[in-house]
UniProtKB/Swiss-Prot annotation:
It is found in: Cytoplasm. Keywords: Cytoplasm, DNA-binding, NAD, Repressor, Transcription, Transcription regulation. This is Redox-sensing transcriptional repressor Rex. PANTHER family: REDOX-SENSING TRANSCRIPTIONAL REPRESSOR REX, REDOX-SENSING TRANSCRIPTIONAL REPRESSOR REX 1. The lineage of its organism: Bacteria, Bacillati, Bacillota, Bacilli, Lactobacillales. Residues 17-56 bind DNA. InterPro entries: CoA-bd (IPR003781), NAD(P)-bd_dom_sf (IPR036291), Rex_DNA-bd_C_dom (IPR009718), Tscrpt_rep_Rex (IPR022876), WH-like_DNA-bd_sf (IPR036388), WH_DNA-bd_sf (IPR036390).
Amino acid sequence: MAIDKSIPKATAKRLSLYYRIFKRFYADQVEKASSKQIADAMGIDSATVRRDFSYFGELGRRGFGYDVTKLMNFFADLLNDHSTTNVLLVGCGNIGRALLHYRFHDRNKMQISMGFDVDDHPMVGTKTADGIPIYGISTINDHVKKADIETAILTVPSTHAQEVADQLIEAGIRGILSFSPVHLQVPKGIIVQYVDLTSELQTLLYFMNQSQD
């Protein structure tokens, strides 16, 4: 199947949502789904669904709908969800601890397999209730290379985010999900996704205010 390499970022961000929808359809024993059904489940319009799917070649036939099992497996392959992806976390503050207890693997084959913080943090040398070990940041290079991990979640204060990101990249990390509200300078080939809770909340409040006008 031919896949267009120049997929827009907006489409790429919807891939995991499509996968989730098709898994839900499959669980509900739905065999075929129309673009309208998919769009309604996603909260978008049918044209967007068809445009997104066009980047991946022939996923369905007009008038016949989309084969749910086929599409579920397609997105599983695309998102590499057939094998477990181990992720590390740096920063065991409030957000970090919440993520350490979040069961990513209940929905997808991702799991936080180790956590890090400053060497004198009280959690260093312990394990979470789920058995995730917490190590000192000074040991991150050795642990990352031994575990062959390429993905990290960053939940450190903004004043330390760049320094820690540099350490992660030096250790071999290729992708970072950052909760720190600063833009990270990274080499070409390193992927960073940002989660800014304050910005998201402000955007929500803006739209709420607009809806009242």
